[in-house]
């Protein structure tokens, strides 16, 4: 009986102990030498829970944090120690017990970290976001995850696999601080994502190019295993699609990868309406009205790449990628019926064609040193082999058989470039210092045959040095950087060089508890493109010539922004006011010329104008009607622009907005949005993109397989529309491109991902260099 009582007592104690111990997060903390770290301060902060669970690691580095009453919550685990950098870990839907893998801390403190149980952690140049477990489960790719987490002002074009900051332009995607291709983002497994960094204030380390924003996805790739998958997005209403296939294999320190992607379109209904009004030398108006006739459109892109990655955690990382890009556009012309002053009705055929091949090799190496110091090397070689042609023909009849006049030219272009980059980073107390140097060497040779038979040979080089420091004083976060560049360009016997500076200052301060205010000032240099610098002159039609200008000089753009943001459990609001000013910008200029016989023609080119200024205000609001289930968002902007040229002044006003909603119900995802017509002005030209109504529904059949439907330009008779208008004192133009086959376009999306293998915490960080210049002069 005593033995039975003893057995029952021991069993009860064991059960009680098990129940007590199960409500906790446990783990072991070590340093880079794998030695245990004692006296580390561990906190667990959960959404909707004001109190924090607190613990301290023992001499063996072991800690345990009580999670009683926190089951099912989304939390952030923070580890602090005076001798090490802070460590953050997102924990979603906490079960009763979690036993974490060994956690390794890096030496030295980079910056004091404020951990909040909110969607965002604000930094001086970025917002940190930890995707919830629901976000991860609902997502099929990197693009899908970016869309699900609702970054402020960010729009994800799921059909074309593009990310934009609404009203500001495209947003490049980085994975572990290395620029990612579309295929890389498609192949990204959402369950490998540690956090998303929304860099809405890119610093000088991103080079001379000024990005509206940058998104960096921090992932923990697989150490052993494989992944294979595809993402197919093809229209069922017309010939249009974008498809990706990829495979990766990991073994110990190595990873091999291969991918293929294509996008294509083949349409039979596309037309361009255009009205041109010329003020001739004698003061008379001459009008040419072009009525569009449906014409075929066809193009195809093909990308293929292989990747090898050799990484030894904490010591080095070597990545090499070889890729090729093929583009072919055999049918890109348009037919028109012409009504011209003083002439009978006639017809015209405009035919631009383009084919190019571009191989790229990208070598990346990163070395890790003690005290959290890193040194990065990147070398990218690019080649473009381009065949471009432009032809404009007129005809007496609708058969388009015997041309009565024709203008045009053909181009055989070659472009070679090599970009090298070195970047060094190390902590300085509670600040972080980053410096680097980048050099580009390029050679371009374009042979033109047509109106003028010429050969353009251009050499260009660019050397860019930068240094940046970021940190904080009490609650004030700061980032101060400066970049300097030496640019060289030569063409024929002429050569030019100039120096560019890019200083940048950012100040950020928390207000009203969960609010933040940020001021940004920067000077961004702008260099002329190789195409505009070309010493070239080509005739487009009877009245128009397009000319290059090798005398163009760089100019600087001064920008100031003030951003206020506030986050609440049920909403997020952000307002940005900005002002931008440019002295002697490169803008369009149209010159009228005439002969004694009364013949008038117009040169379209670029010149240094007097000034350009933009003032804008943009407000973005997100309502979490049912958190993690139903979200409503919208944005509204106002833009005022003023361009002062050598012989013109233009004032431009624009109002723009959008509304959208996202709904998540179990395995179902729904998304719908409306965006207004977008208008932009530059120099003497206005560009418009028509309104868009889109909707998407997805169903997750299994964890690895999902199917969906995507509709774009819904309920719009003319489908996708694009417009251009010229407001010169000599030439008035109004052009609209109609693509009705893209109206009510329904696409079927099928995504499959299969992966096997365990994971590890990634340490890859890097840079991105790519040359997209061809220097080719393109007709309109």
Name each region found by the language model.
Residues 43-45, 78-84, 97-135, 144, ...:
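Short, acidic, small-residue-rich periplasmic hinge/interaction motif at the N-terminus
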Residues 99-104, 112, 116, 142-145, ...:
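N-terminal periplasmic accessory domains that precede
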Residues 143-178:
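Extracytoplasmic beta-strand/coil segments of soluble accessory domains associated
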Residues 176-205, 245:
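Short acidic/polar hinge/loop motifs at secondary-structure boundaries
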Residues 208-215, 223-273, 298-301:
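Outer-membrane beta-barrel translocator/receptor signature
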């Amino acid at each position: 009986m005593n033995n039975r009582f003893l057995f029952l007592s021991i069993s009860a104690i064991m059960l009680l102990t098990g129940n007590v111990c199960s409500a906790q997060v446990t783990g072991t903390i070590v340093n880079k030498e794998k030695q245990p770290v004692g006296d580390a301060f561990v906190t667990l902060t959960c959404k909707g829970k004001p109190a924090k669970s607190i613990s301290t690691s023992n001499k063996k580095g072991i800690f345990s944090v009580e999670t009683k009453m926190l089951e099912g919550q989304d939390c952030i685990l923070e580890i602090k120690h005076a001798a090490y950098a802070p460590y953050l870990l997102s924990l979603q839907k906490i079960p009763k017990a979690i036993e974490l893998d060994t956690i390794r801390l890096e030496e030295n403190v980079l910056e004091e970290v404020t951990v909040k149980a909110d969607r965002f952690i604000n930094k001086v140049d970025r917002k940190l976001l930890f995707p919830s477990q629901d976000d991860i489960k609902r997502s099929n790719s990197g693009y899908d995850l970016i869309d699900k987490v609702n970054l402020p002002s960010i729009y994800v074009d799921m059909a074309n696999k593009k990310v934009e900051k609404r009203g500001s332009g495209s947003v490049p995607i980085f994975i572990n601080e290395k620029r990612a291709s579309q295929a890389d983002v498609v192949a990204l497994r959402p369950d490998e994502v540690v956090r998303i960094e929304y860099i809405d204030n890119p610093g000088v380390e991103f080079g001379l190019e000024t990005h509206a924003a940058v998104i960096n996805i921090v992932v923990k790739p697989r150490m052993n295993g494989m992944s294979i998958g595809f993402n197919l997005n093809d229209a069922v209403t017309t010939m249009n699609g974008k498809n990706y296939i990829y495979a990766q294999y990991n073994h110990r320190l190595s990873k091999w990868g291969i991918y293929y992607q294509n996008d294509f379109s083949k349409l039979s209904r596309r037309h361009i309406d255009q009205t041109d009004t010329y003020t001739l030398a004698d003061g008379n108006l001459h009008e040419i009205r072009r009525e569009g006739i449906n014409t075929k459109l066809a193009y195809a892109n093909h990308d293929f790449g292989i990747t090898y990655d050799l990484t030894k955690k904490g010591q080095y990382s070597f990545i090499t990628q070889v890729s090729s890009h093929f583009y072919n556009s055999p049918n890109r012309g348009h037919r028109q019926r012409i009504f011209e002053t003083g002439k009978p009705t006639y017809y015209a055929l405009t035919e631009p064609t383009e084919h190019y091949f571009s191989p790229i090799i990208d070598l990346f190496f990163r070395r890790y040193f003690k005290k959290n110091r890193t040194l990065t090397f990147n070398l990218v070689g690019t080649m473009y082999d381009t065949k471009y042609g432009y032809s404009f023909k007129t005809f007496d009849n609708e058969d388009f058989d015997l041309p009565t006049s024709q203008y045009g030219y053909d181009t055989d272009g070659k472009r070679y470039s090599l970009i090298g980059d070195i970047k060094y980073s190390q902590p300085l107390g509670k600040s972080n210092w980053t410096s680097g140097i980048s050099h580009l060497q390029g050679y371009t040779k374009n042979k033109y045959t047509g109106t003028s038979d010429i050969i353009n040979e251009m050499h260009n080089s660019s050397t860019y040095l930068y240094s940046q420091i970021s940190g904080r004083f009490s609650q004030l976060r700061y980032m101060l950087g400066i970049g300097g560049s030496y640019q060289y360009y030569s063409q024929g016997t002429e050569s030019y060089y100039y120096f560019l500076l890019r200083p940048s200052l950012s100040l950020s301060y928390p207000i009203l508890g969960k609010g933040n205010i940020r001021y940004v000032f920067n000077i961004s240099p702008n260099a002329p493109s190789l195409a505009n610098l070309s010493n070239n002159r080509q005739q487009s039609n009877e009245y128009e010539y397009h000319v290059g200008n090798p005398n163009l000089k760089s100019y600087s753009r001064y920008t100031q922004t003030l951003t206020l943001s506030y986050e609440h459990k049920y909403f997020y609001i952000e307002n940005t006011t900005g002002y931008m000013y440019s002295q002697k910008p490169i803008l369009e200029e149209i010159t009228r010329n005439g002969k004694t016989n009364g013949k008038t023609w117009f040169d379209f080119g670029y010149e240094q104008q007097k000034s350009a200024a933009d003032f804008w205000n943009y407000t973005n609001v997100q309502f979490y009607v049912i958190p993690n289930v139903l979200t409503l968002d919208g944005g509204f902007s106002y833009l005022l622009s003023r361009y002062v040229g050598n012989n013109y002044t233009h004032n431009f006003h624009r109002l723009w907005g959008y509304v959208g909603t996202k709904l998540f119900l179990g395995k179902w995802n729904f998304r719908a949005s409306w965006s207004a017509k977008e208008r932009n002005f530059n120099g003497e030209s206005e560009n418009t993109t028509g309104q868009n109504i889109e909707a998407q529904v997805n169903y997750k059949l299994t964890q690895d397989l999902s199917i969906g439907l995507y509709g774009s330009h819904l309920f719009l008779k003319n489908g996708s529309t694009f417009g251009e208008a010229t407001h010169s004192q000599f030439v008035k133009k109004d052009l609209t491109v109609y693509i009705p086959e893209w109206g009510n376009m329904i696409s079927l999306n099928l995504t499959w991902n299969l992966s096997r293998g365990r994971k590890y915490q990634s340490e890859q960080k890097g840079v991105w260099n790519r040359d997209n210049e061809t220097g080719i002069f393109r007709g309109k």
